[in-house]
Amino acid sequence: MAEARRRWREAMPGLDPARLVFVDETWASTNMTRTRGRAPSGVRLVMAVPHGHWKTTTFVAGLRADGVVAPVVVDGAINGELFAAYVRQQLAPALRPGDVVVMDNLACHKRAGVREAIEGAGCRLLYLPPYSPDLNPIELAFSKLKALLRKAGERTVDGLWRLLGRLVDEFPPEECRRYLSHSGYRATPS
C-alpha cells in the first residue's frame, strides 16, 4: 500500500489539473445536525436534535479545478449497478475528451461498463491507491457540503434534495483549485 501511494505521488506532477475529474459519493440524511454550538457565557445552548426515523440518500458528483460536475442524488445507498448507470448517463456526457477521471479503489467503481463509458468519452480512468482519501480532493468538498447540510438542518427528503441542488453552486473555481492543491496536485496548468 505504501508503495502504491509513493508511485501515485510520483505521477501526480504529470497530471494536468485542468483535465482532472475526481469522482466520489457521500451520504446525506434528514437527521443531520450540528454537534457543537456556541452560547453566551453561563447560558446553556439549546437546539432541536432529530430522533427516530430519518431518510438517507447518496450524493454522487465529480470535482474539477473549476467546479462540481455531474451531481446526482440517489434515493438510499448506491451500488455497482447504480454507479455504472450514473457514469453512463451523467458523468460521461459531462466529460471533455482528454479528461482524466480519478476514483477511489472501490468494487462498485470497477463495475462492468464504468471504464468503457469513460474511455468511450475519450477520457482516461485512474484509480487511487487503496485507503487514500487524502489524495482525493472531492473529500474536502464533501466535508464542506456536510457542514452546510448540518447548518441548514433540512428534515424532509424533498427539501434535502433541493438543498443539495442549491449547494452545488457553493464551490467556486478558486476554492476547487485550493482543494486540488491541498491534496498535493498542481492547482493550475503549467
Language model regions located:
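Short functional hotspots at interaction and active-site rims
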Residues: 1-190
